[in-house]
Structure formats: structure tokens, C-alpha cells
């Protein structure tokens, strides 16, 4: 027979007023914070990913595709020189 861990049952937690008062504030706050994090462009700066208008430069408009099997290192070097 299993023992009692002393924790509240889940049904008691989600039916309590205190739970919904706390979570009615925190869940929308997290959503708004995430939306602001992405919409302001801070996510691009934090993670170092290029913004949508920075994927291709003015000098290089084609996709950097490796075509050769044996000269791939030279192709990668040529692609990285354009950055």
C-alpha cells in the first residue's frame, strides 16, 4: 500500500480560487512578455539569428549551396568571406 506524500490533490488545486487569481495574472503576463520579446526584435539580438531582411546581402542574393563533394571546404570559405 502506498503512503501519503502530504501533497494537495490536483483537483483541489485547480478548483481553488487562489489558483485562478494567481494564474489569471501570470499566464497572460507570460504571453505578453513573449510577444514583446519577439516583436521588438530582442529575440534576434539575444540568440544571434539574423533578422528577416539580413539573410541575404546586397552583393549575395543566391542561397549558399554546397555543390561539390570534394571541394566543399573551399566553397564554405568562399561563402564565409562574403560576410
UniProtKB/Swiss-Prot annotation:
Cofactor note: With its partner (PsbF) binds heme. PSII binds additional chlorophylls, carotenoids and specific lipids.
Organism: Adiantum capillus-veneris (Maidenhair fern)
Protein name, per record: Cytochrome b559 subunit alpha
Gene3D superfamilies the record matches: Photosystem II cytochrome b559, alpha subunit (1.20.5.860)
Residues passing through the membrane, by range: 21-35
Main localization of the protein described in the UniProt heading: plastid
Functional summary from the UniProt entry: This b-type cytochrome is tightly associated with the reaction center of photosystem II (PSII). PSII is a light-driven water:plastoquinone oxidoreductase that uses light energy to abstract electrons from H(2)O, generating O(2) and a proton gradient subsequently used for ATP formation. It consists of a core antenna complex that captures photons, and an electron transfer chain that converts photonic excitation into a charge separation.
Gene (UniProt): psbE
Cofactor: heme b
Annotated heme binding sites: 23
Entry keywords, A to Z: Chloroplast, Electron transport, Heme, Iron, Membrane, Metal-binding, Photosynthesis, Photosystem II, Plastid, Thylakoid, Transmembrane, Transmembrane helix, Transport
Topology of this chain in the membrane: Single-pass membrane protein
GO cellular component, one term: chloroplast thylakoid membrane
PANTHER family in alphabetical order: CYTOCHROME B559 SUBUNIT BETA-RELATED
UniProt GO MF annotations: electron transfer activity; heme binding; iron ion binding
InterPro entries, alphabetized: PSII_cyt_b559_asu, PSII_cyt_b559_asu_sf, PSII_cyt_b559_CS, PSII_cyt_b559_N, PSII_cytb559_asu_lum
Amino acid at each position: 500500500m502506498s503512503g501519503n506524500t502530504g501533497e494537495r490533490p490536483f483537483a483541489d488545486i485547480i478548483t481553488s480560487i487562489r489558483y485562478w487569481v494567481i494564474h489569471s495574472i501570470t499566464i497572460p503576463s507570460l504571453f505578453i512578455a513573449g510577444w514583446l520579446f519577439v516583436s521588438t526584435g530582442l529575440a534576434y539580438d539575444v540568440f544571434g539569428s539574423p533578422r528577416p531582411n539580413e539573410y541575404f546581402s546586397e552583393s549575395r542574393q543566391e542561397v549558399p549551396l554546397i555543390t561539390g563533394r570534394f571541394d566543399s571546404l573551399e566553397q564554405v570559405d568562399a561563402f564565409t568571406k562574403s560576410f
